[in-house]
Amino acid sequence: MKKPTKKTGIIVSSIGGVLSAVMIAGTIVAYSYQGLLDVTFQSSDYVASVGEKELCKNVAGEGAVLLKNENEALPLDNDETKLALIGQDSVDFVYGGSGSGSVDTATAPTLKSALEGAGYTINQTLWDFYDTGAGKDYRKKTPDMSGHGPFEVNEVPQSVYTTAVKESLKNDDVGIVVIGRSGGESADLPTSELSTGSYYLQIDQNEKDMLKMACDNFDKVIAIINANNPMELDFLEDETYKNVKAAFWLGGVGQEGMHAIPEILNGTTNPSGRLVDTYAYDSTSAPSFKNLGDYTINNSTVTNGNKYLVYGEGIYVGYKYYETRYEDVVLGNTSGYDYSTSVQFPFGYGLSYTTFEWSDFNVTEKEDAYEVTVKVKNKGDHAGKDVVEIYAQKPYTAGGVENASVELVGFTKTGVIKSRDSEIVKVEVKKKDLVSYDYKTNKTYIINKGDHYLSAGRNAHDALNNILALKGKSTSDGMTEDGDKNFAKMIFNQAEIDATTYSKSEVTGNAITNQFDDVDVNYYEDFTYLSRNDWTGTFPTTFKNGSWTATDKMLADLEFFDVTSDTTDDETINAFTYKSDFKDTTYKLPDVMELPYDDTKWDDLISQMTYTQMTKLIRLGGYATVQVDRIGLPKTIDKDGPSGISGTLVGGESTMAWPAEVVMASTWNAPMIQNLGVWFGEDSIAAGVVGVYGPGADIHRSPYSGRNFEYFSEDSMLSYQMAAHELRGLRSKGVLAYVKHFALNDQETNRYGSAIFANEQAIREIFFKGFEGAIVDGGANAAMAAMNRMGARWVGAHRGAMTNVLRDEWGFEGFVITDQASVPAMFYQDMISGLWAGCDMWLNTNESYWALSAYKEDKTMQYYITRSAKNIVYAIAHTWAVNDAYKTNTDGTISETTSKIFPWRALLWIVDCIIWVSAIGSSAFIWISYKKKPE
């Protein structure tokens, strides 16, 4: 036998060494993330039910908003069956958004297949041009999950179209133009001009040319606006594109929503959606636009603590700015503002294929509410649904508490009303929704002095015009059109400010007072928020021009909070007795799960957990919660899921991808969204998923937020109701729905630790409302803390938010988890101050991170750790993982989870053994070969 050469020995030894190193490193990584890898997913035979698919389609159908319908261009005539789908967005339709809110639509229908399935003939030459021909190189571009990459519209230039493609249009009856925009996590839409010379929310030159091509070839063009953010749509009024006879908006359609489009075109579905955002002619005209983007605290060296953002607009978000400024012009309080050139489509706007006549408006006072009734009659030929929107006007006194001219306080959607039939609708307006938050003087909720109005309107502008008509105003005073005073009523006059009636929580009875003085930028610098007392003088500019030299106090506050300096809990902690490493197990979770949170048996149960078990429950909450056999706590799986459970994590299957939240809200059909929550919950059980990271309840503060698709609306009341109803559905199935991102996470740029400043009135009346609805009316028992700061302090460590409002005012009984905490960049989400404030769990999958072993003998931390463990266990006890009562499906059957376990440990051991044996065997072979004497 030939003796191996020295070179061979070196090579074999090196390979063995490398394999051993890889094995060791891989094993360390695997065990560091064992909490993430120890997962159980549904089996691959999941199939959505017929009812679920129908609901997904119907949500998209009811969420579609008809913007224009000149000469009844829609629905299409029966002989208009040959359609040309024009624009690259026709083959690159927006189904959702990117990031954690993305959904798996791999099996979703295309626009072409959906239309063909409904009997339409689609121009194949044009489709192939976009899909596989020269047009395929043109697609929308958006940044990746990390926020890297450009936003590009990338419509196909006219120069790329061949003669054959353009000639093919002559064979079609109607042109269907699709204009799309998308967004996603980690990046906001660009607020500066693109290389094309237009803003992202404007149509660019290539799109204009594409529209011109469509209008040159067709007498009837239908535009589909497939965008989750409100675009500038002035082309709908441009004579150049006069053949665009109809247009409707429809955002991310989800898995089955595409099937709603042919039904809208043929009239099977009569559009009944209403806009959830104001559509301005100039998307940069909103006061929030002046404070969007990347701003730096130039003298801060704190990790993830050198960025800031000031909500200078105060309460004047969306229509609350545009409509209020309009009223002040009509009342003669200001000038220099033209509503008709500012707003194209007001909040709440939407057309129908039929005409609805309203009458018999009436307001009846009840004990805690007003009941508003309206008779709705269908005067047209198409059956359809209508939306009745109720708005309030609260009095404003110059220099006093800010109040918008109108704000939504209730709404309802009719059933299907047949031609010539009518329906009387009732809307309850709670008296508590007529309050304002006075953060300067009374520091609580007040009923302001003066006249209070209610108005029924087809949109916010219509409702305001009705109030103005009741005040005696008309077009001669500058109104855009005369209102109808018969749909407005002055419901009461408040003689003096009432700062008592609503100064205590209706849920807990605790006093309500300021919690966010430190979030107001005036805590550090003098600043004036936008006020209707002086629109021009207080209109926001970019705070500190984007570069802020912070005070020493603020720099200190950006650092980790020293919990030992706080004495709030001293009395409770002194009375607390920590039972370490208890050996007896008197109770198991099923023994106490029906008991109220304050029952002492819960404390007895938690005291049976060891310190290590409690801290693992807190530290390792990424996509799963740990199992604790000692108390009968099962392991649970959590998934991203604002719009449905996605199978993007280490394996697993996908379930129904629902339309984007912005589409859900556009239905203005709260019971429908509650039903969606029920189906979503049944999906979760079928998938073996207990916790869902969603829904999102932040606000569309600006048209440019990248994640607007994942949130409901610019309006606080609509967000409140949609979040509440979706949560009711999810909770009815025992799903742990983590309402997110609490709070002030209304911008993606610099979300890692950015210091967000706002006044307390805006925080409570605007930015907290969606979360309040999810918790107070929806029963949410889990929430996700945002990555940003409230003021100088990370949200999860802000006690005012985490405990004083969330628990002491809203009665929240559950736990708060952080956003992503599995990488060192997230270590600013300090666990010690977070536990003190009321954050309970870290979304972490790495066993070596967030160690708490050093605090085992620290009584203060023992208390906070035990409290958080209780919050977590209590919430999980109220899920389908523990309580089988949640598993009864809508059809009466019992849902069973079919598990598929990924045996990664066994596989890792086998691979390790093979590598070890190979390495040892190779080395031994070389060694023996060298030692052998030549034959």
Where are these regions (language model features)?
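Glycoside hydrolase catalytic-domain context in secreted enzymes
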Residues: M1-D438, I446-A456, A460, T508-E935
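Terminal connector regions
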Residues: K431-S503
